[in-house]
């Protein structure tokens, strides 16, 4: 009797699992999905790959779309809400819906450009602005060699109020302030903060030093690799542009800009070892960033209220090449900050000292 009951239970579980994994044919006659709601996203993906991301490049629009996912989602503060004032809705599209307000926040300088570029595509789809911003970021990152395939959720309602100012961390903020802001926004640990900053491996600054727009944070801004975590540990010796800009400190390479916040997080005792742990560890940077992005992309929402459509995201190209010191650098140029683990031994690229080219505009 017990054995028969066990077989019956196994059969029920098998049927349930089959139901959960059964795919539906999408109306396009090409794709299938685990949820019919996801079917429309394939066409949106192909549209923005072609017309927003220049046929699938990991370029400026990808960098800016990823930045926008964060600037929208981090706009939430339970601490502010506890005072009886609206604390923001997280990933709710408010940064675009109330662009005339939020783009005037100092921390959001420059996001108006990608908001303007995305606006026509939002109008062409049935997606909420909240969903589109996060979706576009995930689609764009899939163009970058070495990146993880990021999770996608839909079902977020759009914002009805703007986020409060000063919820987006600034590059001149202290480590204390940055860690506190992330903890308030979504209970992010210091390790998760470091993981989210992996986004800077495919990023550039336009407004920290306005004289040199498109200046990358590492020497490979078109590749999702660990060079950002290596190069922020190199001794800073120069400013790539004018110098003396708020939130900027000296960088190790011509053409590369270093944020004060990145420099300090790389050297703070609470984050230095986690920072160093990403060096030459592609599997970790992928898994940690994917997990932290998943948490960030649903801020202000419960995951159970959303539908996951991660299958729509294409597998990013594989990473080629190895972690390295830029040409002209040696291990003596590393500023060891982790007190418990030696910095991984790396060889330098051959040739003359590395000079980093700006990210070209679209």
From Swiss-Prot:
Sequence positions that bind Ca(2+) 2: 201, 218, 220, 223, 225
Cofactor note: Binds 1 heme b (iron(II)-protoporphyrin IX) group per subunit.
Signal peptide (UniProt feature, chain positions): 1-18
Pfam families linked: peroxidase, Peroxidase_ext
Catalysed transformations (reactions): 2 Mn(2+) + H2O2 + 2 H(+) = 2 Mn(3+) + 2 H2O
GO cellular component: extracellular region
Keywords: Calcium, Disulfide bond, Glycoprotein, Heme, Hydrogen peroxide, Iron, Lignin degradation, Manganese, Metal-binding, Oxidoreductase, Peroxidase, Secreted, Signal
PROSITE patterns xrefs: PEROXIDASE_1 (PS00435), PEROXIDASE_2 (PS00436), PEROXIDASE_4 (PS50873)
Glycosylation sites (chain numbering): 126
An example molecular function term from Gene Ontology annotations: heme binding
Induction: By a combination of high manganese and malonate levels.
The protein's role, per its UniProt record: Catalyzes the oxidation of Mn(2+) to Mn(3+). The latter, acting as a diffusible redox mediator, is capable of oxidizing a variety of lignin compounds. This isozyme is also able to oxidize phenols and amines in the absence of Mn(2+), similar to versatile peroxidases.
Family: Belongs to the peroxidase family. Ligninase subfamily.
Protein's recorded name: Manganese peroxidase 3
Source organism of this protein record: Phlebia radiata (White-rot fungus)
Lineage of producing organism: Eukaryota, Fungi, Dikarya, Basidiomycota, Agaricomycotina
Gene name per UniProt: mnp3
